[in-house]
Amino acid sequence: ADGDELIELAPPGDESLADLANLMNRRHRWRRSRGAVLFDRPEGRFRLRDGELEVHVTEPSPARQLVSEAMLLMGSVVAGFGQEHQLALPFRSQPMASLPTTEELERIPEGPAQDAAIKRCLSRGVQGTCPMPHFSLGLPSYVQATSPIRRYADLVTHRQILAQLAGTEVLPEERLGELIDDLDDPLRQSVQIAREDQRHWQQVWLARHRDQSWSVIFLRWLRPQDSLALVHVSDLAMDLVGVAQGADPTPGQTLSMTVAHVDSDRGELQLQFA
């Protein structure tokens, strides 16, 4: 909140953060002009704090955009450094996607449903030793480099750059490629575990509030033959997957939803639309 105030008010003698935010906004617009796919909406996550389950909603803000854009800028600069010095790095890329046309998007109400229509067209990111464009970031090349404590690949990037600057031996491309291959499965598993963790706590939360009626936005059918639906719960700022009954909605339609059945131990969730 303090950062947002400094950016928005730019008090005399303390304009540096606002100036930096303006620079990052220009960078943000530049990426958008290059086709970056941007989703600036609240995001909810469940957290256990002192044994209590609570919803934490992260709202978009000037300070968060500044930090996010600065992190992407660093990743772009590091990628450029690697290319300039022919340095093997764990580049992240994303294949080009064919997005819905303007006419197709106009048939879907603006908001989470439009976002879902775009997201389903995007391919999974790829990590490799060769610099390639990252479609949704709107960048010609990119390397994650801001979290060497949290991500091993970021640590490898830092060690490669430090070795290059010091004139000492760097990892050759072949060895780095082997490291990336070794990391691929554990990274996929960690992402899947994180998703399953959130899905579990969603179901625990809904079990505790199963008498409540929720206003949801229908996003799409994941498996129409099984009535498996994807909906957005605005009060929780998160998407929800469950077997749905009671209506045949279209993307973007707002519905009233109740929980017909939930078993968090079995991972079962049935929704009733009205």
Model-derived regions, located:
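Short beta-strand-to-coil "C-cap" segments at the C-terminal boundary of structured domains/repeats
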Residues: 272-274
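Electropositive polyanion-binding surfaces
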Residues: 1-255, 260-270
